[in-house]
């Protein structure tokens, strides 16, 4: 395993051939059975957005695929019989899936090794909590209260496949790997026309790697230029020095602004800046003038258009003034709230009052959008009035109840950090009454008669799971009081928003 890892280590003096272990089975066997790369899983999870796709990866299937490739020589593809070739036909989607997944596994290794080397000597045991979605909000509470403006940026996707190939070319210098990579991309587009109407069965590992490499390239350039605006001779981002014609591209990019580069650096210089990215969006918080925040806005527009050749409209970059506007981020509406405090001070026989203003980040639930989502899924109407879920009446009573309890628990779990619980209680009320109406419709009864027959024990099911969790976190005296329902609670075990959507 050390030999394989040593082969994959980045070395500027030679070209990396990523396809070598793809065509030599002994290296595939090492990848399939050796657990030496398991120590990189934590590092890889930091590099990738979602690590849940590893559950669908089968090393045995990959081994059998490699054997069939050797026996049938399927990689020799005549261009005349491109559509008739069984490797590229409708029945060969499985082969493409596994080859693309295997290619992503191989290409991920050097990136994980290099990223893991940057974390040497640092403790990563607490990184699991940092992967939680809720871990972002305590950071925002601590930082955004001291800033004036927030730049909300929607990260664009490349509209042409060659942009993805060129992005990967900056880091992978092996021509054969890039040609194979381009082949996989274009074949995916050909198959997409046939399989777009069906449920997608493509493994997302390959495309998650593409997305993360695309975002990594954008962020590395942004941080590099950001560092140069504060420290002109900084060389902390050594990963950028291995690119092809990097300085030529940067020099061309800077001409977009003006020739007077020191003046631009002086205008963009801002030591008080914070950057957060999640789910295809990023926010840039700063404490400065509107002129500077507008310059950052057009910096992002020119970065995407000039460097990545992606048409990027300026309306995709929103400037929010926290004291006036709401920042919509990860399902919450955040804004700054001024809390006046009056302090009475006494010195000897004289007493006086001191007026203080405390700035606090207010996180609210977007009740309108949530009611719209519930109405779209037929839990209520557009006004928020609960209705019965007609499509669930064929299920058993316990199944219906468990579904509603799980949905209510997930929503309560995620929006426990809201500063105002009134909207959360309204959502719970909609789900509870929808559950009762669904059960009453199944038994062909009215809601009043159904509740009278079963009693109040039915609605207690919605409170059991959440109360058990909170009772383990807080002391009994604090839990028994009503203060618990007025505080914000951030959980550090919410890793995916899909868990809330799929109710798993």
Swiss-Prot record:
GO molecular function: RNA binding
InterPro entries: Domain_X (IPR024937), Maturase_MatK (IPR002866), Maturase_MatK_N (IPR024942)
RNA-binding listed as a keyword: yes
KW Iron (keyword) present: no
An annotated GO cellular component: chloroplast
GO BP term (any one): RNA splicing
Cell compartments where the protein resides: Plastid, Chloroplast
UniProt keyword terms in alphabetical order: Chloroplast, mRNA processing, Plastid, RNA-binding, tRNA processing
Predominant location: plastid
Similarity field: Belongs to the intron maturase 2 family. MatK subfamily.
PANTHER family given in the database record: MATURASE K (PTHR34811:SF1)
Function noted in UniProt: Usually encoded in the trnK tRNA gene intron. Probably assists in splicing its own and other chloroplast group II introns.
Protein name from the UniProt record: Maturase K
Organism expressing this protein natively: Crucihimalaya wallichii
């Amino acid at each position: 395993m050390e030999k394989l890892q040593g082969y994959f280590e980045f070395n500027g003096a030679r070209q990396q051939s990523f396809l070598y272990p793809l065509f030599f089975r002994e290296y595939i066997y090492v990848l399939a059975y050796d657990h030496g790369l398991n120590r990189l899983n934590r590092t890889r999870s930091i590099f990738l957005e979602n690590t849940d796709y590893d559950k669908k990866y089968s090393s045995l299937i990959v081994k059998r695929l490699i054997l069939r490739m050797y026996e049938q020589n399927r990689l020799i593809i005549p261009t005349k019989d491109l559509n008739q070739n069984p490797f590229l036909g409708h029945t060969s989607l499985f082969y493409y899936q596994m080859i693309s997944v295997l290619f992503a596994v191989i290409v991920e290794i050097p990136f994980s090794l290099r990223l893991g080397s940057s974390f040497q000597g640092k403790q990563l045991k607490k990184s699991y909590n940092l992967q939680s979605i809720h871990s972002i909000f305590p950071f925002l509470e601590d930082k955004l209260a001291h800033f004036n403006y927030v730049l909300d940026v929607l990260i664009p996707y490349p509209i042409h496949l060659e942009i993805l190939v060129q992005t990967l070319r900056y880091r992978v210098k092996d021509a054969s790997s890039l040609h194979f990579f381009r082949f996989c991309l274009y074949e995916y587009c050909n198959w997409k026309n046939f399989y777009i109407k069906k449920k997608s069965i493509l493994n997302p590992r390959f495309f998650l790697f593409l997305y993360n490499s695309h975002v990594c390239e954008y962020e590395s350039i942004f941080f590099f230029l950001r560092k140069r605006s504060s420290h002109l001779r900084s060389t902390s981002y050594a990963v950028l020095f291995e690119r092809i014609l990097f300085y030529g591209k940067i020099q061309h990019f800077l001409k977009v602004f003006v020739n007077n580069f020191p003046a631009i650096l002086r205008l963009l210089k801002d030591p008080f800046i914070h950057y957060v990215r999640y789910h295809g969006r990023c926010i840039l918080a700063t404490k400065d003038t509107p002129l500077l925040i507008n310059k950052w806005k057009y910096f992002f527009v020119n970065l995407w258009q000039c460097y990545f050749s992606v048409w990027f409209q300026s309306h995709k970059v929103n400037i929010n003034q926290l004291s006036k506007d709401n920042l919509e981020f990860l399902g919450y509406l955040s804004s700054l709230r001024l809390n006046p405090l009056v302090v009475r001070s006494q010195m000897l026989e004289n007493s006086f009052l001191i007026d203080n203003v405390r700035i606090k980040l207010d996180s609210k639930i977007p009740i309108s959008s949530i009611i719209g989502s519930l109405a779209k899924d037929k839990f209520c109407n557009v006004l928020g009035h609960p209705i019965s879920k007609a499509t669930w009446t064929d299920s058993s009573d316990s199944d219906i109840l468990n579904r509603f309890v799980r949905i209510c628990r997930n929503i309560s779990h995620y929006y426990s950090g809201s500063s105002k619980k009134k909207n959360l209680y309204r959502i719970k009320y909609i789900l509870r009454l929808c559950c009762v109406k669904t059960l009453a419709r199944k038994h062909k009864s009215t809601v009043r008669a159904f509740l009278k027959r079963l009693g109040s024990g039915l609605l207690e099911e919605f409170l059991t799971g959440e109360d058990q969790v909170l009772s383990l976190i807080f002391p009994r005296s604090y839990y028994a009081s009503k203060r618990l329902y007025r505080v914000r609670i951030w959980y550090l075990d919410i890793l995916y928003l899909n868990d809330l959507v799929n109710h798993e």
